UniProtKB/Swiss-Prot annotation:
Belongs to the G protein gamma family. The keyword Transferase does not apply. It is found in: Cell membrane. It is a lipid-anchor. The keyword Endoplasmic reticulum does not apply. This is Guanine nucleotide-binding protein G(I)/G(S)/G(O) subunit gamma-7. It comes from the Eukaryota. GO terms for biological process: behavioral fear response; G protein-coupled receptor signaling pathway; locomotory behavior; receptor guanylyl cyclase signaling pathway. A lipid is attached at C65 (S-geranylgeranyl cysteine). Pfam families: G-gamma. Keywords: Acetylation, Cell membrane, Lipoprotein, Membrane, Methylation, Prenylation, Transducer. Its main location: membrane.
Amino acid sequence: MSGTNNVAQARKLVEQLRIEAGIERIKVSKASSELMSYCEQHARNDPLLVGVPASENPFKDKKPCIIL
C-alpha cells in the first residue's frame, strides 16, 4: 500500500514540477522596476495615499453619538 502511495505522490510531484517549469520567469530587477512604475502611475488614484473624501467614505459616522 505504501508503495502505491509513494508512486502517486511522485507522480503528483512530477506534474507540479512540470507546471512550475512552464511558468515564464523574469528577473527581479525587471519585475521591481515594473512594479515601481505601476505604483507611480496609479498613486493619484490610491485611497491609501491620497485619502478618501469624507462625503464618499462609507465608514464615516453619519450622525454623532447622542449618548455622549
